[in-house]
Amino acid sequence: MAYFLSDGLTKEVEENKNYGGICTIFDEDYPVLLKEIYNPPLVFFYNGNFSLLNAPTLAIVGARKHSPYAKEVLKKLLPDILDEGIATVSGLAKGIDSLAHKITLSEKGKTIGVIGTGLDRTYPRENFELQANMEKEGIVLSEYALGQKPLRFHFPARNRIISGLCQSLLVVEARRQSGSLITANMALQENRNVLAVPGNINSILSEGCNELILEGAKPILRAEDILEEFKI
């Protein structure tokens, strides 16, 4: 509570006023699912279509260095998912994250980006145009105020928001020690549906997904497998 009475928050609100919006956990329109998680952000900043944060949402995570198979999978799955009004959410990182956002936009769908910097920064820099497009066609949000640089501990914290905003989380490709598996575990702890794309048993990029399936994650072979989780 002290944070909401502090000069620091007042300054952050003023700085973000002309850039986008700000939402606190006390606001009526704070995302319902996000509020349910163990450690929801007390404040977050956003730029884009706020209503998407209460839409049916599929989180998509995976390897930063992915194979062509991952692109084929998302191009096959996403059109039917997006046609049902389901938004995608990911972290605007290299690899699967960026791929999911780009394919969603190319299919005229809605996508949510959760970043580990202030909204006035782009990390990685190569996603500058993608982030700008998402602010127009979807929404980008962060619990970090303007000017905040990317710090290592920001990204695990960001992942809890990704899993917190979704009803279901899909892991597309992941190594055995991938950070995507940590996000999947967060989703599981928050009672979200964890889904995984099975892959070649000889590919290190599919080891994490195949092991998730062995542990009980739902294997995804077609879009209908995902839509079932949304009762569609």
Could you describe each region identified by the protein language model?
Residues M1-E28:
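Short, small/acidic-rich helices and loops at N termini and domain boundaries
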Residues I25-I232:
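Glycine-biased, small-residue-rich flexible motifs in mid-sequence functional cores and linkers
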